Amino acid sequence: MLFRSEIVVPAGDGAEAFVSVEDIAAVAAVTLTEPEKHAGRAYAPTGPQALTMAKAAEMISAAAGRTIAYRDTDREEWIAAMVSSGLPAEYAQVLRPLTATLASGNGARPNRDVLDVSGKAPVTFVEFAAKTAPAWK
């Protein structure tokens, strides 16, 4: 959640190998159009580098030309704030384990799924930040 030039999320110092929606779509498209080749396989596409939220905020700041800070917060307070902002309570509950995974660093191991399945290197976070910079201004 972006609030007053801050990314506020209960992630602590956990790292994540953030993956772009384009890369997820590329993997999905290949597996759906070549089902025999991918039958019985499971993929967990990742980006090429694991980053903490603080490092991600630094990269977004550089691309956007303004400071975007990361602020860790208490998970339960964050969920309550999301619900009070209009997020359905049922969906907010789904965020509890997702943010716990982020905080634990369980998603911090980049893999080759995007490259191996789609044939192209995954989008870097710097590329993502540059592409989405207008949204952060």
Show where each model-derived region lies.
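Short helix/strand-capping connector loops at secondary-structure junctions
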Residues: 107-116
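Histidine kinase transmitter module recognition
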Residues: 34, 117-120
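Conserved active-site and cofactor/substrate-binding residues in soluble primary-metabolism enzymes
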Residues: 19, 51, 109, 120-123
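Amphipathic terminal alpha-helices
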Residues: 113, 121-137
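Oxidoreductase cofactor-interface core, primarily capturing Rossmann-like NAD(P)-dependent enzymes
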Residues: 1-69, 73-85, 89-91, 97-104, ...
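Short, hydrophobic/aliphatic alpha-helical segments
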Residues: 105-108, 130
